[in-house]
Amino acid sequence: MKRHIGVACLVTCVTAASALAQDVRITQELDKVSVNLNGANVVIERNQNQATRLSSEFTKTSRPCPPFCIQPMSLAPGVQTFGELEVISFLQSEVQDGSGLLIDTRLPEWFEKGSIPGAVNLPFSTLEADNPFRDEILRALGASDSTGSWDFSGVFTLTLFCNGPWCAQTAIAVSALLEVGFPPEKLNFYRGGMQNWLLLGLTTTNSAG
């Protein structure tokens, strides 16, 4: 009897260890990251429930093009394209030390449904030339026009994203910034956007504790 109990305990322990070994990690070496955002500690990790399926707008495979056309991997010379690991690294470095901003270029109603932790909502349309408040926005991004022309030497590094590879909002925002003289080396494009972020089960503002 004791032998049977011992075998049962061994099987239970091995099963439990196997379950722990199957945790959904960010990378093989990284299970989660902790980032201090505006004085609050936020943990970014992946959803551990392996039965989870998307059930939102992001389950669609097909949308009319235009306007929902597939975006290129590269938006413009000098503008880097990021994946999820680069976005996480950007949060850990530039956003955390105050030299960078993660920009959600979607409209406010989409931002309020959930975004990437640490993101600032700056709708793409606010960067267009006909917006009377655009100059104020550029100043908030670190630009200066005290000499009568724009000086972008002190701007934040920006990583911009929208709904996903089928969403043109970030492309429009980047184009508007480049047109006014924003340096391309200060711009990063997270092409996967919320579609890929959610697909990988990464923490959002709706799930961050």
Annotated model-derived regions:
Residues 140-195:
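Catalytic cysteine-centered active loop of the rhodanese-like fold, especially the PTP/DSP P-loop
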Residues 20-113:
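Flexible, polar/low-complexity N-terminal or interdomain linker segments that lie immediately upstream
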Residues 1-9:
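Bacterial N-terminal signal peptides that target proteins for export
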Residues 8-16:
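Bacterial N-terminal signal peptides
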Residues 200-209:
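Active-site neighborhoods of enzymes that stabilize oxyanions during catalysis
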Residues 107-111, 126-129, 164-168, 193-197:
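Solvent-exposed loop/turn segments at secondary-structure junctions
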Residues 113-117, 134, 170-174, 200-201:
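Short, solvent-exposed loop/turn and secondary-structure capping segments
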Residues 88-156:
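Mid-length scaffold segments of soluble, non-membrane domains
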